[in-house]
Amino acid sequence: MASLSLKNVCKVYPNGFEAVKDFNLEIADQEFIIFVGPSGCGKSTTLRMIAGLEDISSGELKIGDRVVNDVEPKDRDIAMVFQNYALYPHMSVYDNMAFGLKLRKVPKDQIDKMVKEAAKILDLTPLLDRKPKALSGGQRQRVAMGRAIVRNPKVFLMDEPLSNLDAKLRVQMRIEIAKLHQRLGTTIIYVTHDQTEAMTLGTRIVVMKDGVIQQVDTPQNLYEKPCNLFVAGFMGSPQMNFLDATVKVEGDIANLVIAGHSIPLPPAKSKKLIDGGYDGKVVIFGIRPEDVYDSEMYIETSPQSVFTSTIKVYELLGAEVYLYFDLDEFPMTARVDSRTTARPGDTVKFALDVEKIHVFDKETEQVITN
């Protein structure tokens, strides 16, 4: 197993397009790191540079203590699992898993042992004689992972491995990959655009946009303490509610004035706005849907954060309900208990958890309070 280090790594294509910009990251041995971001943000390009499938334009990549910028992919001691499985259709599951070992001239008895061990880990033993066309999508993806496991690499790279699977299979395979990481204790770098995969699998998440790292943190910290507007909006579904608000300072308390409502902030958040000189300025106010309540208990205990709106859309998702409405001209979403009596057309009172309010600078989009 191995640690990785990327220092000032850049990728510039011949046409001048800068796909990855000054990428700096230290990955510890046995970490499960997720690269997440929208399409075209540079996450797969970064993974391919680590794999050696893309040249590094500038900067330094280390695997363990060795600089590998100019090392061939086959000599980096890594294994990659692709989105499209990349299985040989004419070979059996056994032969697909054994192929890389045969190329490396591993003894036949050792190949047999390694393939069968990997097959046992991934529950593929009954399928070893089958061809890929006789397998389901989830089984094919397990074969692709098995082919990587048998090599016993220092690092696993996974490029959107679950994106071709249906929703139910994706959940099953997420669990399988988590178990695999626990069992093998290996370093995994995993690329996805799916924030659910990122939040559930990663020990740390790297959020990217336009080739630039926005934030690197644990899933919980990313969700609760986003560093800017992009991270706050990208992580979480439904996404965070954003509204323009004007700061009005009264003594040592900062109020957010939104659509005629004045919401006093807690002392710690107030201090950051006051110290930052935001009195009278327009800021961006953010709050997650689960921190908007329609229950009487919250309405009674948080009277200063209460507002009224008319429900536009009601979505039932089993144990919870999404309520969609407007606050002034700003669209809002509340994630509430399924026992709510609110329905489209109803005028409903809502209360906010002021401790969970995020405030962002309107110009820089950086967080002011967390």
What are the residue ranges of the model-derived segments?
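ATP-binding/catalytic-site motifs of ATP-hydrolyzing domains
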Residues: 60, 66, 212
